[in-house]
Amino acid sequence: MVEWTATERTHIEAIWSKIDIDVCGPLALQRCLIVYPWTQRYFGSFGDLSTDAAIVGNPKVANHGVVALTGLRTALDHMDDIKATYATLSVLHSEKLHVDPDNFRLLCDCLTIVVAGKFGPTLRPEMQAAWQKYLSAVVSALGRQYH
């Protein structure tokens, strides 16, 4: 179980309060698929992902970005039991979808870049530290089934 300070919780809540899931979710997944093109293999049913423009304009990518970020947001309400919160998703991604667990980290790295771009200098280092800890806890929980 991850231990959270009151300050960390406040920072994470502050970041989530300013994230527009409908904007940041698609941007993070688009960035992930473009920067790490090997991640595209999990999205064969999404249609054309052959160019950056095709990825950015793909409504299935945008929709899944919203789904992924909505799922990531779930941890905010369950910070004291993140592993249990993601147990079912961990099984799904490992046993049915066979997703490389490192891809969770790649998506979260892309999300951090999107968030930093939106926040600019208001995303102070101590806020980013709390955010990274939060994302690491979620990535660990999602990859738990693989261990």
UniProtKB/Swiss-Prot annotation:
Globin domain location: 3-147
Keywords noted in UniProt: Heme, Iron, Metal-binding, Oxygen transport, Transport
Positions that bind heme b: H64, H93
Pfam families referenced in this protein's UniProt entry, alphabetically: Globin (PF00042)
InterPro entries in the record: Globin, Globin-like_sf, Globin/Proto, Hemoglobin_b, Hemoglobin_oxygen_transport
Tissue: Red blood cells.
CDD domains the record matches: Hb-beta-like
GO terms for biological process, alphabetical: hydrogen peroxide catabolic process
UniProt-recorded Gene Ontology molecular function terms: haptoglobin binding; heme binding; metal ion binding; organic acid binding; oxygen binding; oxygen carrier activity; peroxidase activity
GO CC aspect terms: blood microparticle; haptoglobin-hemoglobin complex; hemoglobin complex
Record-stated family: Belongs to the globin family.
Function: Involved in oxygen transport from gills to the various peripheral tissues.
Quaternary context: Hb 1 is a heterotetramer of two alpha-1 and two beta-1 chains. Hb 2 is a heterotetramer of two alpha-2 and two beta-1 chains.
Protein name, per record: Hemoglobin subunit beta-1
